[in-house]
Amino acid sequence: MGRQLLLLLGMLAMGAGAVQAQPSQAIGETETCRSVANETLQSLQTRKAGLEQELKRLGERPTPTVRKVQEDILDVVFQMECLNVAQPTNLKRSVAKRSVGPGGGGAPKELVEVTTYYATNRNKTGSLEPVKLYGGNYEGNFHYGRAVVSIPKTHKPGEVEKPNPLMRLIFEPDPSKHFVLKSVEPLDMDVARKEMAQKLNAPGSAKAILVFVHGYNSGFNDAAMRAAQITYDLNFQGMPFFYSWPSAARIRAYLPDEESARLSESIFENLIEDLTTKLPVTDIYIVAHSMGTRVVSHALQHRAEKGKPNTQLRELLLAAPDINAELFRGVIAPKLTAMQGLRTTVYASSSDLALMASKVVHGYQRVGETTSGVFTYPGIETIDASSASSSSRALGHSYVVDTPSVIGDIKSIVLNHATAKQRGLTSSGAVPNVYWKFP
């Protein structure tokens, strides 16, 4: 189980964690990637198919032999990803395409700045550097703050442009080419509420909030930059906001992150209560990714069970949800669909290698993974994004935030409240198990 879990950690880290994570960021992956030097994608696919047949022959009873075959399957899947993104030739191309010089002095002309507010229950480290201000330890209450992220004018939708990891050890990011977390300022609760209220009441404001919730292996700075990227790419005219729960931002911290996510459910529930009762907001849109979907889904489930009225939550977008599909179907989905005024959209894919690995480790299908069938539930729109995602990019796990066609789909939801049919998606399946695909 230890080896199997470690492989899952590496895969989820590369696909769901740090912004534009590179293989060199994932400690412990190097030896596995070196082992594919004499392999081809075809040979690995053949091995994987043979192992899957063996697993089918053995059945689902949890024996040591079954577990060994499961581990071997994970090993092969991870090696396939190594061929896609971790070979030295690919790394060299990445280095060649990025700036290797130090950031220029003075204020660069070719950038835009996005100011986003946040809530977090991470511990403060005592550091004054924006990227080191918060750690990965859990605190029992959340507090507010404000972050400023600069985005280069050369930005491409779906990207969070950063220096190559090797160069990052030597040079600072160049603001004319890279995302930069310029400032992070914790705010007193009353001060934050007043400032956010002024923002929402400003002339031309949509009085709307876009809330982003990150997944496993994400640091505070990763969440800030991803929230800024989504806001910018969607051309969202309301107030950007993100919630950063205390992910340890380490590959080997999958199990601790699961515990932190579970503990943070009540924190996010309290946050939603604060946003809806203390601010002049009319519409709230939530985009949650991977393990972050657990935090959000359970928090809203608890609100529904307590009979909390819903007058401001409009759209809930669950991106590649790493949630037990049976738990979601039996416990969470009934509560979400009962919340009047809230529409829930699930994005799933058959190319999500990270969730395939999670399914093997947990023993249950994940809501965001479709190789065993597309999750459907009456009142929830499920989008099979397999045709718009690729396992060769971030393990096929970040397509919702890094694929222009999917970002465009989200934009239609948030800005126009368009249904899947109105967005031009193609229906599949029969009632009541209808889902949608990209054309």
Give the location of each predicted region.
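Lipolytic serine-hydrolase domain surface
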Residues: 85-204, 224-240, 244-283, 300-315, ...
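The conserved beta1-alpha1 loop
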Residues: 211-215, 320
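Short, charge/polar-rich alpha-helical segments
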Residues: 24-45
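Gly/Ala-rich beta-loop-alpha elbow adjacent to hydrolase catalytic centers
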Residues: 268, 288, 292, 296
